[in-house]
Amino acid sequence: MSVVGIDLGFQSCYVAVARAGGIETIANEYSDRCTPACISFGPKNRSIGAAAKSQVISNAKNTVQGFKRFHGRAFSDPFVEAEKSNLAYDIVQLPTGLTGIKVTYMEEERNFTTEQVTAMLLSKLKETAESVLKKPVVDCVVSVPCFYTDAERRSVMDATQIAGLNCLRLMNETTAVALAYGIYKQDLPALEEKPRNVVFVDMGHSAYQVSVCAFNRGKLKVLATAFDTTLGGRKFDEVLVNHFCEEFGKKYKLDIKSKIRALLRLSQECEKLKKLMSANASDLPLSIECFMNDVDVSGTMNRGKFLEMCNDLLARVEPPLRSVLEQTKLKKEDIYAVEIVGGATRIPAVKEKISKFFGKELSTTLNADEAVTRGCALQCAILSPAFKVREFSITDVVPYPISLRWNSPAEEGSSDCEVFSKNHAAPFSKVLTFYRKEPFTLEAYYSSPQDLPYPDPAIAQFSVQKVTPQSDGSSSKVKVKVRVNVHGIFSVSSASLVEVHKSEENEEPMETDQNAKEEEKMQVDQEEPHVEEQQQQTPAENKAESEEMETSQAGSKDKKMDQPPQAKKAKVKTSTVDLPIENQLLWQIDREMLNLYIENEGKMIMQDKLEKERNDAKNAVEEYVYEMRDKLSGEYEKFVSEDDRNSFTLKLEDTENWLYEDGEDQPKQVYVDKLAELKNLGQPIKIRFQESEERPKLFEELGKQIQQYMKIISSFKNKEDQYDHLDAADMTKVEKSTNEAMEWMNNKLNLQNKQSLTMDPVVKSKEIEAKIKELTSTCSPIISKPKPKVEPPKEEQKNAEQNGPVDGQGDNPGPQAAEQGTDTAVPSDSDKKLPEMDID
């Protein structure tokens, strides 16, 4: 079973796998552990990753990058509107209202959803993992930013399904970093001790995330998160791009932003310049040849000037840091360490801002690029039954408060209740109780839209079906279970109706008003399968939840007044009936469409595979032409006649011309046939050359064998002690085989020496190998017979038996030795225990 963690980044992706030796970040086909989040669409296939990155400028309109933030977003979303101007490719509104990506693929215009494009990237990462692991990859853990909303998370989950992956968990990037940090720490405080608080700062290419985590031995608890969803490395790149656009506009009279290819080239150069400035404070040049209209451009920049230009961006570093401390009510002194990850944290000014805020040195014990994917792989190993990993519990948080709204018959309007507060533990379940006579709808939404980096606070609508009144016409008790799951996705996971069956019992005491109130009071039960500490509800929450009944508290008093005052207490039996729930999720892809996307992805993978095979077949022909042409005038020259060489060379030249003309775009089989045709002419020449190389070595080996056996025969005839135990008949057999082999070798050597090198050899290397094997199998068993052992005289054996070991210490130890043996250390069970985990 494979265990894979995927860091799905805005600019680049990483894949880590868990193996017996530990967690390993794997390299792609270019021997690079970083795979660009880039897809290029061509007339016959798709290029994904590094191959697509090289086409960003040459195939700008059909090369897609920076699509991560379009997940779960409508085309009319303000974020999408703002991004349009930065994109080289076109985005369109899909029939569902979501953002689609428009490209030309297979010679026709196609609109792909963000989920489909992400699935293409995931398929590539899956293929990379499979090529390293040499087995299928299905189970994985994928990272997402901690600020992703429900719609965005569901969108990424759909993308994993399209790619044929089973995502065990969508893991917040900061939580993955915290896991990678904490699981290997041996010095964490015990569970009963005060936890160690660590701040994790992750500034990547597109976003800035901060989290505070509390660590105890075997336990990680996220306390709070904060973020700036648009502050990242690309914002610093944009500052440089805008500066040079303005400078080159004045200096060279160029309107750079009017040409997307020029803008892309400038962006690439500015990113390189930014990285150089992180290591150098001196003036650095930026030069681009034939930039626009065949004009060469150049400029300079230094770190000091760059930081002045970035003052507005640097001012945005502190607020999230301050926010997490305020949310957790921690002081700066309570923070044990500040770990930084992400490419943009390498900018010296960013590091300085963070360090100055906390008043301490920053910790860089984690790999800034690979920490997220390593954390995801560790989480996958924890979830997988195939690996034994030390116990480590992870409690995440809900980033935004989630509320439910419903129509309240008693209040003749809508009621609402906050079910999960900001930074509530997750995954988490709660059971809400409603009193209803008919089906009802719950509307889930984020209750603080001002904190949401998303225009629509709605999450989903959940309709609880088949609710009926009790047999006496009263409202039924409906228990609804709401949950934030391991992916951070909210759902109404189940609903059940409590059926009450009553039978009058005269001897039972009368029901009091107090009993009725107690029955109605309990409205919210909390289930906590993944969280160790029970969270207490605040009075405000209790108040809100007590209003979930059909009537308010005042209404319940009125209701009791309508009942007969002398009603006898009934013997109550209850049973529960599961109720169906209809979900209306925001921007959710329906199952039928998802299956279509899965089918289309399979077709595109097959098309890519066929095109790769076709290209490989074409390249094989081209490679063979160049190889044979060089060798015909080189090492193969002596092994082909002049006429044959001339005709073959002409054939090779014709094939080369054909490849660049009529053979430019042919089916795979045409190239396979063409290569076979060339090999029919070239293979005999190649074989003659190989035979001339191998034959002398093998004849030499055969000669050595013959010489060795002749010496042994001579020694036997001279009656030397070493061979006097051998049988004369057997040695005659050896002599006969050796003489036959010598005669065969001399005969073949003479014939071969008379044969021209341009002709096929008289004897092939395989025949010589067979002769060596035949000679060895006949002679070796005979000459390697060991001499028979000579038994010593009986008297000597008797004396040897009488001479026992000194002091009686021999094979049978005496009582003293046995006593000593009892004191020797025996390995205890604890010493024999397996290590806690098999991942270093």
Swiss-Prot record:
Source organism, top-level taxon: Eukaryota
Residue ranges, annotated region (Disordered): 500-575, 779-840
A Pfam family that the UniProt record links to this protein: HSP70
Phosphothreonine modifications at: T538
A single cellular component GO annotation: nucleus
Annotated localization: Cytoplasm
Entry-linked PROSITE patterns: HSP70_2, HSP70_3
Gene Ontology terms, MF aspect: adenyl-nucleotide exchange factor activity; ATP binding; ATP-dependent protein folding chaperone
Principal subcellular localisation of the protein: cytoplasm
Biased segments, Basic and acidic residues type: 514-533, 788-799, 829-840
GO terms, biological process: chaperone-mediated protein complex assembly; protein folding; protein import into mitochondrial matrix; response to unfolded protein
Disulfide bonds: none
Gene3D superfamilies, per database record: 1.20.1270.10, 3.30.30.30, 3.30.420.40, Actin, Chain A, domain 4, Substrate Binding Domain Of DNAk, Chain A, domain 1
Residue(s) carrying N6-acetyllysine: K53, K430, K679
N6-methyllysine, modified sites: K773
Residue(s) carrying Phosphotyrosine: Y89, Y336, Y660
Keywords: Acetylation, ATP-binding, Cytoplasm, Methylation, Nucleotide-binding, Phosphoprotein, Stress response
Family: Belongs to the heat shock protein 70 family.
Name listed for the protein in its UniProt record: Heat shock 70 kDa protein 4
Gene behind the chain: HSPA4
